[in-house]
């Protein structure tokens, strides 16, 4: 299903104890607002989690899991982990899009590279689609995520179509419709970053906490290097 549809849900990848432990690690390491137990309301995500030992260990563990390992080439490395925490107080929607940027160590001038940017102190670039097609995102749900919790909505099979213009993306969604990716506690959503996806605001009183890992090839073309890379 991953190769044909661009995504697959993997129920029960993490146990309830795993989810509780990971949520506690996030609370321990990510900055809180004024020493309180709530992160700033305008801070929906934190991109640099791979610098923490617990996150590196989780990346290594994921690469060896029977449900994940067949989806990854043996030389794959974890290159990014972003934490998303959507609540009624810290809420957002994401319009239809593809994930086009990757985190790299330094800027390289090459005609194939575009869209240089800096996010949370890290350097990002948009490489050609042929590299993006090699990437795999794994989203770990630390909470149940139902329709009212702002889950991802995906347009199946659009990962095979390269980088799409906004007009083409909208036309594909209108023609094909969307799939709502609801998930139980501990479920993982594995997806290709070029898959068209969006999400709505949460209308529930429950948190929607997700650890979003990205895996890719160990070496990059065009003189690029990953900003971080974790090999199992």
Regions found by a protein language model. Name each.
Residues 1-4, 11-118, 232:
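Non-heme Fe(II)-dependent double-stranded beta-helix
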Residues 7, 135-137, 208-210:
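Short hydrophobic/aromatic beta-strand or adjacent loop that forms the aromatic wall/cage
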